[in-house]
Amino acid sequence: MSQGQGGITLDDLIAQADYLKRYIDSLQRTQLELLESINSIDSAKQAIETIKSGNKEMLVFIDRKGYLLAKVGGIIGDKVTVHLGLSYYAEVDLDSAIKILDKRKDEISKAAQNLNNELQKAASTYNQIVDILNQIQQAAARRQQGE
C-alpha cells in the first residue's frame, strides 16, 4: 500500500518493530533497577530492625553484589542516616527512618507498576506488528511457491 492510500509501508512496520523492541528493552532495564531499589529498601529496613533489637554486631556487604562481607561491631542503635533523594541525607531516629523508607518504597512500587503497565502495552503492540510481519512473510512465500 502506498502512503497516499492511508496505509503504511513494510519499511515503516519494520522500523516500528525495531523501535518498540529497543523501547521494551529500555523499560525492562528500568524495571530491573526499580526492583533492585525495592530490595535495597527492604534490606535497609531489615538492618534497622536488627539495630532496634539491640544487636550490637551486624554483617554488612562492602560491595553492591555481595562479594565481600564485614562484621561491624559497636553499633549504637538510636539514629541512622537515610537517603532522602538526590544528594540529600538526614540523620533520624530508627522509627522515622522506617517511615521514610516505607514512603520511598511505596513511591518506587507505584512507579514500577506504571512502568509494568507501559511495558505490557508496548509488548502487545510489538507482538501485533510481529504478527503482521509474519503474515506478510507467509503471503510472500506462498506467492513465490505459486510462481
Swiss-Prot record:
InterPro entries (alphabetical): PFD_alpha_archaea, Prefoldin, Prefoldin_subunit_alpha
Disulfide bonding pattern of the chain: none
Predominant subcellular localization, coarse grouping: cytoplasm
Subcellular location, record wording: Cytoplasm
GO cellular component: cytoplasm; prefoldin complex
GO molecular function: unfolded protein binding
Pfam families tied to this protein: Prefoldin
GO biological process: protein folding
Record keywords: Chaperone, Cytoplasm
Cytoplasm as UniProt keyword: yes
Role of this protein: Molecular chaperone capable of stabilizing a range of proteins. Seems to fulfill an ATP-independent, HSP70-like function in archaeal de novo protein folding.
Annotated family: Belongs to the prefoldin alpha subunit family.
Assembly description: Heterohexamer of two alpha and four beta subunits.
This protein's name: Prefoldin subunit alpha
Record gene name: pfdA
